[in-house]
Amino acid sequence: MPDRPEVADHYGTNYRDFGSDIYAQVRRAAFGEDLGQNSWLTLAQLERFVAHLDVRAGDRLLDVACGSGGPAVRVARLTGCEVVGVDLYRDAVANEQRLVDATKPRARFLQADASKPLPFVDASFDAVVCIDAINHLPDRPRVLADWARVLRPGGRLVFTDPVSITGALDSAEIAIRTSIGYFLFVPAEENRRLIDAAGFDLLTVEDTTVELAETARRRGAARDELAAELRQVEGDDAFEGRQRFFAVVAELAAQARLSRYAYVAKKRG
């Protein structure tokens, strides 16, 4: 299994420059609105997922691998709930804290490794969300069981898996798709089985693969438009590697060979 520091190198570097205007321009071009997301999440998807989470003022939501914190802050504003975000990377947490200081939402963030047991007591959250990050965590049965542990009975879970196997992949495509670090690939049917085994009732599965293909295409195109500036920040090799990454993500999703699903579940009990 690849070392997790390989992932940290990509994401740590990315978060250090995350607040710069050049990356904000890319996000605006790709998503239409800059939520501060470092995932495939669109505003329309965020609003749908918030409805599935069914959180409101007085509830506590855990955002696992929350990245820059932008979507978490938006959820806190939309719902009035308290959001607790955890992320592995120090620069991500620093960016999150700047958002909190500037906007004063009901949100707080801490650095924690989501591949290990989370630093929270049992049944301490009303909902858990994880967007486009479960695929970076090894031992999915243990991860889902830990999310169930921190959820109260009846609590909601929403997570997206952007690398569900739904077609044939060759070694070159896999190498590019995993070039940013560790990935765990499972078929959609395995996610369903693991959700049930962890103590959840699956409520719905949403196929967001078409949206993924378009978002990846737009991100690559936006970066092409800003290539000169991005090459200065990233260097030529890193820039070209990321462009190959976005191109392969778009192609595999457009051909429905690697799909993105959103899972909505409720903890039994």
Residue ranges and their predicted role:
Residues 162-182:
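Short, glycine-/aromatic-enriched active-site segment of Class I SAM-dependent methyltransferases
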Residues 184-199:
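Short alpha-helix
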Residues 141-156:
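A short glycine-rich, Lys/Arg-flanked "PGG" loop and its adjoining helix->strand segment in the class I
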Residues 62-64, 68-116:
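Class I SAM-dependent methyltransferase SAM/SAH-binding core
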Residues 1-29:
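N-terminal, positively charged/glycine-rich alpha-helical extensions of SAM-dependent methyltransferases
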Residues 39-57:
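Conserved alpha-helix/loop element of class I SAM-dependent methyltransferases that forms part
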Residues 116-127:
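A short acidic, Gly/Pro-enriched loop at the edge of an enzyme's catalytic core
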Residues 204-269:
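Conserved Class I S-adenosyl-L-methionine
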